[in-house]
Amino acid sequence: MSIIVKNLTHIYNEGMPFASKALDDVSFEIKDRDFVGLIGHTGSGKSTLIQHLNGLLKPSSGEIFINDFNITDKNLNLTEIRKRVGVVFQYPEYQLFEETIDKDIAFGPSNLGLEESEIHNRVKASMEAVGLDYEGFKDKSPFELSGGQKRRVAIAGVIAMNPEVLILDEPTAGLDPGGRDEIFNLIKDLHEKKNMTIILSSHSMDDMAKLAKTLIVMNHGSVEFMGTPREVFKSNASKLKDIGLDIPQVLELALKLREKGFDISEDILTLEEAKQEILKVVRGRGLC
């Protein structure tokens, strides 16, 4: 599904003494089946933007189009949009409540009025999609699982609704490095195998550089930069630091080496690219 955001502004407590503008004239377009990384410092407007994309918040002004649906139209029934646009919020495991994993994942599809056989098929398929064996996990309590496994169950509950767009707000928050890598690999697989449009909010610049096809950088409620990871990081490294954001570690290394006089390209995002550049410099100096 394509998403078009036009001149979106959101003011909390509008008209009140403590009014606060969280989004300021935001505009962008996301193509069908894109993988978008949404980055920005705390308070940049990322979470507020996410809540607009399936109608959880209404804008103060502006429009959002999901395919041909203007979801800011007051006369539009948002139920159909929310079936198509799934949102996984921060710490989604806190939303788990059923006594078994099977029942928890089935909760959403059950509210769609589906046949029991279809609900079963969706639960089984979504568990397998997130790497949980159905027979091995279906009767377990979600509260017996590790943090990473709980996160997988929560994501499966959204996938079971068969959304065309999956939005994830800091899905690895609070996980150890192993759990974080598992979730990022899962999201990558969902994008590749299910052809979903993915919008991923994260503070991990290294993972964003590897996963996302498009980056949207938010700053004080506005879109600061938008482009491919290579375009955004290569052209705006110093500006990103100025607004409180990191850059990928391999690019940081390249910039440090350039400061020391090494002729290292700034167009580096992966470890393999960094290795090749360093080898080129070493060989050029006759060191190997």
Swiss-Prot record:
SUPFAM superfamilies: P-loop containing nucleoside triphosphate hydrolases (SSF52540). One of its GO terms (cellular component) is ATP-binding cassette (ABC) transporter complex. One of its GO terms (molecular function) is ATP hydrolysis activity. The keyword NADP does not apply. It is found in: Cell membrane. Gene3D superfamilies: P-loop containing nucleotide triphosphate hydrolases (3.40.50.300). Keywords: ATP-binding, Cell membrane, Membrane, Nucleotide-binding, Translocase, Transport. Signal peptide: none annotated. Residues 3-245 form the ABC transporter domain. SMART domains: AAA. It is a peripheral membrane protein. The keyword NAD does not apply. ATP binds at G40, H41, T42, G43, S44, G45, K46, S47. Its EC number is 7.-.-.-. NCBIfam families: ECF_ATPase_2, PRK13637.1. Forms a stable energy-coupling factor (ECF) transporter complex composed of 2 membrane-embedded substrate-binding proteins (S component), 2 ATP-binding proteins (A component) and 2 transmembrane proteins (T component). Belongs to the ABC transporter superfamily. Energy-coupling factor EcfA family. PANTHER family: ENERGY-COUPLING FACTOR TRANSPORTER ATP-BINDING PROTEIN ECFA2, HEAVY METAL TRANSPORTER. ATP-binding (A) component of a common energy-coupling factor (ECF) ABC-transporter complex. Unlike classic ABC transporters this ECF transporter provides the energy necessary to transport a number of different substrates. This is Energy-coupling factor transporter ATP-binding protein EcfA2.
